[in-house]
């Protein structure tokens, strides 16, 4: 067919219509030399180098944020850390609160177990067991050793521990008031020399009332609550009533008695403000001690009536204590033996 179209010349150039590679549909899908790729690049086809690779332009960096001027807050040991979620923080706070609550409960149980252990040890020791004295708390190098054993948390029942502790603090306050009374009387004596008798009596009251009040009314009260002793209750009521009367007299402050009460503070000569203020403070302290003493006497009496104690029980305890005393029994035996010997020698 080609020969018929070209006039039968076999050397004629083929026309574009007879070349299948010149078809417009094929030419459209041929790759362009301007954008040659590695797959279709022919180094022998042209002497021009391939186009240079152009990397994509980098994205612009965000501007740096300004540093915060607010100082970082230090978290407390119990505060949960911020993990970026409100629900997480709430759950962490709840867990921490629950742990603290459990820890407090465990501490209370541990204290209760310690108290019960001390009570069991006290019951195992018994009343006749020997224990090392610990009061007054003197240093080891002191030649005078402690005279009493005192442990309110171990020896006193739990429902009476607060009352016994209050009475112990009352005794300490009365001792402090006597020391301040001595200083006030000394200041008054320095201002007015005719107050020598009151100053001398203030020294006597410090030396006399401090040990006697502890032995005569505090120790009987302590032993009464420790062993539910009716006899010690009666001893305490009698002596502490007298002590309350003395507290009232100390607060009144009769001149010349050695007490810096209200009357003694008000009769200080004018111009001695410091001495007057010191004596008024002592009078106020004496008044507070007197009021607290009366209140505690009434309170302990109400506790005594609820314990089932009575005067007959006190008599029985006194008789049992007297007859169980070895010295009393020895004296009674010697007296009986002497009486019998005299009876046999009589004509």
From Swiss-Prot:
Which cellular component terms (GO) are annotated to the entry? extracellular exosome; intracellular membrane-bounded organelle; recycling endosome membrane; trans-Golgi network membrane
The PTM Phosphoserine maps to: 32, 72, 76, 85
Q: Which residues cross the membrane?
A: 171-191, 197-217, 247-267, 277-297
Skewed-composition ranges (Pro residues): 49-66
Q: Which residues carry this modification: Phosphotyrosine?
A: 41, 53, 83
State the annotated membrane topology for this chain.
Multi-pass membrane protein
What job does this protein perform? Functions in post-Golgi recycling pathways. Acts as a recycling carrier to the cell surface.
Family stated for the protein in its record:
Belongs to the SCAMP family.
What name appears for this protein in its UniProt entry?
Secretory carrier-associated membrane protein 3
Q: Which organism is it from?
A: Homo sapiens (Human)
Gene assigned in the entry: SCAMP3
């Amino acid at each position: 067919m080609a020969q018929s179209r070209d006039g039968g010349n076999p050397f004629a150039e083929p026309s574009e219509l007879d070349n299948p590679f010149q078809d417009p549909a094929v030419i459209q899908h041929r790759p362009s030399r301007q954008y040659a790729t590695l797959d279709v690049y022919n180094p022998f086809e042209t002497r021009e180098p391939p186009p240079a690779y152009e990397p994509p332009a980098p994205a612009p960096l965000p501007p740096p944020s300004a540093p915060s001027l607010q100082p970082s807050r230090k978290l407390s040991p119990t505060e949960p850390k911020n993990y970026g979620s409100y629900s997480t923080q709430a759950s962490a706070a709840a867990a921490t609160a629950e742990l603290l609550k459990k820890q407090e409960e465990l501490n209370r149980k541990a204290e209760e177990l310690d108290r019960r252990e001390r009570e069991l040890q006290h019951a195992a020791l018994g009343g006749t067991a020997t224990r090392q004295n610990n009061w007054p708390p003197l240093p080891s190098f002191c030649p005078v050793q402690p005279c009493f054993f005192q442990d309110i948390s171990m020896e006193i029942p739990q429902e009476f521990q607060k009352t016994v502790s209050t009475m112990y603090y009352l005794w300490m306050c009365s001792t402090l008031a006597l020391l301040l009374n001595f200083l006030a009387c000394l200041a008054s004596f320095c201002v007015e020399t005719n107050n020598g008798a009151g100053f001398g009596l203030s020294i006597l009251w410090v030396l006399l009332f401090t040990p006697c009040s502890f032995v005569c009314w505090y120790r009987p009260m302590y032993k009464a609550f420790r062993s539910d002793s009716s006899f010690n209750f009666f001893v305490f009521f009698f002596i502490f009533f007298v002590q309350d009367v003395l507290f009232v007299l100390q607060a009144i402050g009769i001149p010349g008695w050695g007490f810096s009460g209200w009357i003694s503070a008000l009769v200080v000569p004018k111009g001695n403000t410091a001495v007057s203020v010191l004596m008024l403070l002592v009078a106020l302290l004496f008044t507070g001690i007197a009021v607290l003493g009366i209140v505690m006497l009434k309170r302990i009496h109400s506790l005594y009536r609820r314990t089932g104690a009575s005067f007959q029980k006190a008599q029985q305890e006194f008789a049992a204590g007297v007859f169980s005393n070895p010295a009393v029994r020895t004296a009674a035996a010697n007296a009986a033996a002497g009486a019998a010997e005299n009876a046999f020698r009589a004509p």
